Amino acid sequence: MRLALPLTLAFALGALSSHAKDPALGATTFTVYEAFLSPAQEPGEESETPKLLQKSLGATAPSTPREQRKSRGHGVLRFSKDLTRAYVEVEMTGVNPDDILMFHIHCGPPGVLGPVVVDFGELGNLSKTLANGRWSMELTNANLTFIKDIKGMKSGLPESCPAELGFLAQTRTLASLESLARKGVLYFNLHTKAHTYYGEMRGQLYAAQP
């Protein structure tokens, strides 16, 4: 009877594959995260923009309370298993493309404003690329943003995302970005003329459901 447990364990271990996989699968298989964007996920109203930032990051068009906005969106972020590429696909409704100012991936838990790690505005005119409400792109390590200064804000803030929350090292690779996604601390944020500081709508990224 004493041999039963060791034998069972040995059989279980023997059943596991000990063979390495084809390395090419790293570029063709993916870890997928998704977000449904809505104004309700923004942590504040435009009227609550801090006074010190109203000139640089305040609205330049009349704002609407979150519960009255019609903007909605869905975004997918796919990481190749070898973490050399990531792919973003976004679809939005209820937003005038001409009103779009910025679109980012930030890091931060739900209800918290966090620094920018991917600035989609650096990759083309957002009003044009989102004109039909759909947009997709490929990301590499080179697309990760290290923002040292924003006009009107203290020099050095914000500086990308931490490789680990509460840790000083910054995110510089897709591997670090995927690690943050796994923890549920990445979010899409769309900024418009009417909703600039907090944003028009936001979507926290979580592992995609089958």
Over which residues does each language-model region extend?
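Fungal secretory targeting signals
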Residues: 1-17
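N-terminal leader/targeting pre-sequences
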Residues: 18-210
